[in-house]
């Protein structure tokens, strides 16, 4: 079944020049396609909506600060099982636990600055795509 998912390349990925490498890995995997891509600086309101479920947790404020520290790449990936697949390609949040060959395993340095966000379910993908790409049908 063809799916769509939101992927964010976080400020550390942009700062380190990893956009092409990460986008290439997504495109090469299982014939997935990038159907929208924007470089943007996220405002506090958008981030609050996106990460609202984490408000009050110890990592929330540092995460909000980090995500506003520079531009991000927001993109839409489409393909068979792309939601599960991009998360697997990204690897676990902790780069030490991430296997070589995964994005975080190959390029990750610390848990908080972990290069990439990918929707974790069809429901999350739908909500996140509406937030980041409201004009998408």
Swiss-Prot record:
InterPro entries: NDK-like_dom, NDK-like_dom_sf, Nucleoside_diP_kinase, Nucleoside_diP_kinase_AS. ATP binds at residues 10, 59, 87, 93, 104, 114. The keyword Kinase applies. It is found in: Cytoplasm. GO terms for cellular component: cytoplasm. The active site is at 117 (pros-phosphohistidine intermediate). Its EC number is 2.7.4.6. Keywords: ATP-binding, Cytoplasm, Kinase, Magnesium, Metal-binding, Nucleotide metabolism, Nucleotide-binding, Phosphoprotein, Transferase. It is an enzyme of class 2 (transferase). Its cofactor is Mg(2+). It catalyses: a 2'-deoxyribonucleoside 5'-diphosphate + ATP = a 2'-deoxyribonucleoside 5'-triphosphate + ADP; a ribonucleoside 5'-diphosphate + ATP = a ribonucleoside 5'-triphosphate + ADP. Gene3D superfamilies: Nucleoside diphosphate kinase-like domain. GO terms for molecular function: ATP binding; metal ion binding; nucleoside diphosphate kinase activity. Signal peptide: none annotated. Belongs to the NDK family. Homotetramer. This is Nucleoside diphosphate kinase. The gene is ndk.
